[in-house]
Amino acid sequence: MAEPWKVAKFGGNCVSRPDMYDRIAKVLTTDPLRKFVVVSAIAGVTDSLVTTVVKPREEKEIDLLIGELRRKHLSLLPKSRGNHDTAVETLDALTTKLERLLYGVAYTEEITPRTKDFVLSFGERMSAQVVAANLRERGVDAVPHEADVIGVMTDDNYGNATALFDETRSRLAPFLERQADAGHSSVITGFFGMSQEGKTATFGRGGSDYSAAVVAYALQLPTIEIWKDVGGFMSADPKIVPEAFSLSALSYDEAAELSYFGAKVLHPRAVQPARAGNASLVLKNIFEPSEVGTRIGPDTVDKTGDVKSISFVRDLATLKVFASGAGSKESLLSEAATALSDAGINVYSAATSQTCIAFLVDSSAVGHAKNVLGRVPSDVLDRIEVLPHASLICFVGEGLGYAHGIAARVFRAVAEKGVNVQLISAGASMVAYTFTVETKDLEPAVRAVHREFFAHRYGAVASGHASVAPHSAT
């Protein structure tokens, strides 16, 4: 039986410089099974588009943006006429369409979620053209494809859509299999698909990892490679803990928890389609392709109860909702959490007592969150207090929920550094515990927890790494 094909996803920094295309081509030609390539937008492009649609712009600003996007993408094209001219024609058509779209937004001074998603999709659309042209220049028979055209189907939740797995499989798989059988390498846009209404819907920022896993699910492939300009997961952020070391394997749940709570090497939603397809996610460093990286899959579960990694999220705030008998008012927690969710506010953690419900949210959203909670109908609501300058620390490992004494070791190590723990959360997941500290205490707390569990390895850890993963949100 022939070996199965693979999906290889390349992040924004991997497609942002001309010299990177030599590396991408080498990755693909070294292993011809890497037939399906999923790409992010070139680094910085989506940020520029987001800035543009947050507030309608004047025509002069739109002209400057379109000019800059065109120059950036054209500067990355190969020089040979055939590959260059074909890509230029398509890029011109894309930038013209984007320009007209932004003029329309400026004229009406409003933008719907559907229109916003369509605008944001242009980063990946342009990137796919540039990547495919460069791969053809280097001998790879690459053909660019737009995900919403070839069959990546989603629900109608614009801005944070979810792929419809079975519908995507029935539409996407036959098309891509024909492309591969014909010898083509498909370069597919990440980040978006087509909604049930026939409109472009995005998966949220960083959603190209998720796209790659969806493509693998549709094709029933066992391996999704996530190529970035950094390594895989580490035991902690090496910027804070110099002794941090690389992790060769994680379970699905461990990877999802670490990604959600600050480790930015993988989008947390990428785990869902990988798990559904029983596939492995392999995080690879494009600068060190021979390194093992981190494998996440069905065969990497280690339930020893050991702590595997520590991640964190900065710049949070705790909202404390005081209410008489809060703990016995079952509907109050539900109503408050639903109100925050409906307002698009991410809640990292929640805890309740007899007199108070506490929510952990981004500090940038705390004012909005306070207003939202203030409108929750309740005859028992007393007051709302804000505790600013909070950071969340998460420690992860399969089987932690069954291990004895792990939490005690963590909090003892933190207390010995004079750090006060504010909000503790355990039990929602059997693989992760979280707690909050004041932001000024974050770094010493992370170092203390890491030393508590990994001090025995410090003598064996090299003084430096060829590359390090940015393990946390900054």
What would you call each of these model-derived segments?
Residues 149-151, 288, 428:
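Residue-level detector of flexible, active-site-proximal loop/helix-junction positions
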Residues 33, 140, 279, 345, ...:
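Short phosphate-binding/catalytic loops that engage adenosine nucleotides
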Residues 1-266, 271, 362, 436-438, ...:
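Nucleotide/pyrophosphate-binding catalytic subdomain
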Residues 290-474:
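A conserved regulatory-domain signal marking ACT and ACT-like small-molecule sensing domains
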Residues 104-105, 111, 116, 241, ...:
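Residue-level detector of functional hotspots within protein domains
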Residues 223-225, 280-283, 288:
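Internal nucleotide-binding/catalytic subdomain
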